[in-house]
Curated annotation (Swiss-Prot):
Ranges in coiled-coil conformation: none
Lineage: Bacteria, Bacillati, Cyanobacteriota, Cyanophyceae, Synechococcales
Compartments where located: Cellular thylakoid membrane
Gene Ontology MF terms in the entry: chlorophyll binding
Source organism of this protein record: Prochlorococcus marinus (strain NATL2A)
Name of the protein: Divinyl chlorophyll a/b light-harvesting protein PcbA
Length: 349
């Protein structure tokens, strides 16, 4: 984290990232615990929504988030999209809750039992995951593993659609989807993905992403930088704070894209499960409103789009904050300048 040359800098308890910056073991513990929290939310909220779900009311007209996604995947609903009971939904929720306990236990083990720094581990493979923030070889080695995991997740999604099937709103039923690896279609959908209307193209894009991510991951793991690590290549700029800022930029951008996509696309986000497409409005900031009158209620699509947008907005603000700090900008100078406005003067000499 940025210290502005002060080797004895301390942070408040709320600056959680600072406590794991140079402790790779604690860093992994925090990741595992965070994953456990996400899994717990997914499982608990799915059960909460299932308890409130009313089959007599269109799902898209109920304030639901988890159930519409499960319905899109064909979980808890038959081939025609009819609700067939909550046993499959409960099973998914319980798996997430059990997984959250396993992740939480892993976080506690890494925090309390294992070494706080992977460099001190007795396992040679573990020592490779030490944190050297200004070492591009170390950072790309870790990045490579992340990319492979993302690629495997894409493969799971593509294979689920191919073997089990997903909901196709064009026929109002669940069907198996074979991915289309037409590279010209994939290239074109970079610019019109908001209006994509073919599940084959959606799965083809994910299959192509899986190939790119796994190939890129293997490349980053196996290779090292060529030549000297100079300032032109980023020496002195690569740091924990810089990587945090880039991560926030990435997740913020994905959230904003998801907001626009979920607001209008009815192939990936079927009307049956998420409600009618939204209208974009402008006030203090952009927001989406329902195009159907539900009284004081809102569609699943409205919740999904607006929450993603505002989360994305604040993530991007966090990116700017940490990016400026990583570049050496001291925000305390701003508050200092403002506090001295009354006594500041201009000399003509």
């Amino acid at each position: 984290m940025q210290t502005y040359g002060n080797s004895a800098v301390t942070y408040g308890w709320w600056a959680g990232n600072s406590g794991v910056t140079n402790r790779s073991g604690k860093f992994i513990a925090a990741h595992a615990a965070h994953t456990g929290l996400i899994a717990f939310w997914a499982g608990a909220f799915t059960l909460f929504e299932l308890a409130r779900f009313d089959p007599s009311v269109p799902m898209g007209h109920q304030p639901l988030i988890a159930l519409p996604h499960l319905a899109t995947l064909g979980i808890g609903f038959d081939e025609t999209g009819t609700f067939v009971g909550g046993s499959a939904v409960v099973a998914v929720a319980v798996c997430h809750l059990v997984g959250s306990m396993a992740y939480g236990a892993g976080g506690l083990m890494h925090s309390l039992l294992f070494s706080s720094d992977m460099q001190e581990s007795s396992v040679p493979q573990a020592r490779k995951f030490k944190l050297e923030w200004d070492n591009p070889d170390n950072q790309t080695f870790i990045l490579g593993h992340h990319l492979i995991f993302f690629g495997v997740a894409c493969i799971w999604f593509v294979e689920w659609a191919r073997i089990h099937g997903v909901y196709d709103p064009s026929i109002g039923a669940i069907r198996q989807v074979e991915y289309d690896l037409n590279l010209s279609h994939i290239w074109d959908h970079q610019f019109d993905f908001l209006t994509i209307d073919s599940l084959e193209d959606v799965m083809g894009g994910h299959a192509f992403l899986a190939f790119l991510e796994i190939t890129g991951g293997a490349f980053h793991i196996a290779t090292k930088q060529v030549g000297e690590y100079t300032k032109f290549k980023g020496a002195g700029l690569l740091s924990a704070e810089a990587i945090l800022s880039w991560s926030l930029a990435g997740i913020g951008w994905m959230a904003v894209v998801a907001a626009f996509w979920s607001a209008t696309n009815t192939t990936v986000y079927p009307v049956e499960w998420f409600g009618e497409p939204l209208a974009l409005k402008f006030g203090i900031s952009p927001y989406w409103v329902d195009t159907v009158d539900l009284g004081s209620a809102h569609t699943s699509r409205a919740w999904l789009a607006n929450v993603h947008y505002y989360f994305g907005f604040f993530f991007i603000q966090g990116h700017l904050w940490h990016a400026l700090r990583a570049m050496g900008f001291d925000f305390k100078r701003v508050t200092s300048a403002l506090s001295n406005l009354d006594t500041a003067s201009v000399s003509l000499k």
